[in-house]
Amino acid sequence: MDIKNVHIKNHEQTAHAPSTLEKIRKVKQGGKLSEQTKTFGSTYRRLDPNQPSPTVTRSGYRDFIHPFEDRMLTVRELACLQTFPLDWEFTGTRLDSYSSKRKVTMTQFGQVGNAVPPLLAEAVAKAVSEQLLDVIDEK
């Protein structure tokens, strides 16, 4: 497959406000903005390419800065951290939006953050299946 000619779904970058870019630029690899400003908690955290990723959460678009570029991760990049295959498509809006009844709809970022990583789910299912088969075989 020629990757140059493949459209990767859910890989749209956010157009950051100048004030957000200013915050992002301050954060070094593996660091957090809160280490410099004593605010923002765990948000604005730049990934270290040599370390495991922190847990991806529903609000992940505010948590993870690309390790090499001054921008937040895309839905697709977060999905890759969660082990979703490249052909998996997330639907709905990327960021929070409100319906006419003022209920928050599930966003693409929310779908990724709320998901059990597929490879983790597979490993758990295999382990449970093996244990159940062992119990059945014992009877």
UniProtKB/Swiss-Prot annotation:
This is Type II methyltransferase M.AquIB. Belongs to the class I-like SAM-binding methyltransferase superfamily. C5-methyltransferase family. The lineage of its organism: Bacteria, Bacillati, Cyanobacteriota, Cyanophyceae, Oscillatoriophycideae. Its EC number is 2.1.1.37. Keywords: DNA-binding, Methyltransferase, Restriction system, S-adenosyl-L-methionine, Transferase. Corresponds to the C-terminal half of the enzymatic domain. InterPro entries: C5-Methyltransferase, C5_MeTfrase, C5_meth_CS, SAM-dependent_MTases_sf. It catalyses: a 2'-deoxycytidine in DNA + S-adenosyl-L-methionine = a 5-methyl-2'-deoxycytidine in DNA + S-adenosyl-L-homocysteine + H(+). Residues 38-58 are annotated as: Disordered. The keyword Chloroplast does not apply.
